[in-house]
Amino acid sequence: MASKFLREYKLVVVGGGGVGKSCLTIQLIQSHFVDEYDPTIEDSYRKQCVIDEEVALLDVLDTAGQEEYSAMREQYMRTGEGFLLVYSITSRQSFEEIMTFQQQILRVKDKDYFPIIVVGNKCDLEGERQVSKQEGQQLADDFGCKFIETSAKSRINVDNAFYDIVREIRRYNKEMAGYTAGGASGANNGGPQGKMEVSEGEKESGCCCILM
């Protein structure tokens, strides 16, 4: 039975321009694929759902990928509870930009770790792939977070990507609560340093399976 307590989660979708951040967000919220590319400055969406028998209100902020909005992006990062770092599997450059976004989040949050998930989007375009699944998984391993490949167009793993970051926020908050209750002090930035443990089964679940 789902809990009736409504917890709001502030999720921020970040990544380079044209990687499909808006398409993923709108597919989650409206179950609709947006075909045309219209660069985003800032859009906010809300959706109520049940994740692991707990009611959740997802407050999703879709951010600009263009470099000229980087100062505005830092403002979003201050309020976000969890981040989806999105690249396109068809763009090596967008993949390489993910490291910069991750470092920016940790700097703004003043943490060594914060809830994130690495998302390789456009996995329906296998013939145009420039970034292997192994590379995406390795980057996520380096970050200590989960990796998942998605397709907004084919609605592959869209819900899973957003639900997984909510699960990671819950796990992180429990660790923080335990850390505070334990009265620990001194760890680098005032919080637990433990990264997300991702099992081999969970790694496999992040793959992109296209039904022909």
Curated annotation (Swiss-Prot):
A motif (Effector region) lies at residues 37-45. Alternates between an inactive form bound to GDP and an active form bound to GTP. Activated by a guanine nucleotide-exchange factor (GEF) and inactivated by a GTPase-activating protein (GAP). GO terms for molecular function: G protein activity; GTP binding. It holds the Pfam family Ras. A lipid is attached at C209 (S-geranylgeranyl cysteine). SUPFAM superfamilies: P-loop containing nucleoside triphosphate hydrolases. InterPro entries: P-loop_NTPase (IPR027417), Small_GTP-bd (IPR005225), Small_GTPase (IPR001806), Small_GTPase_Ras-type (IPR020849). PROSITE patterns: RAS. It is a lipid-anchor. Keywords: Cell membrane, GTP-binding, Hydrolase, Lipoprotein, Membrane, Methylation, Nucleotide-binding, Prenylation. This is Ras-like protein. The lineage of its organism: Eukaryota, Fungi, Dikarya, Ascomycota, Pezizomycotina. The gene is ras1.
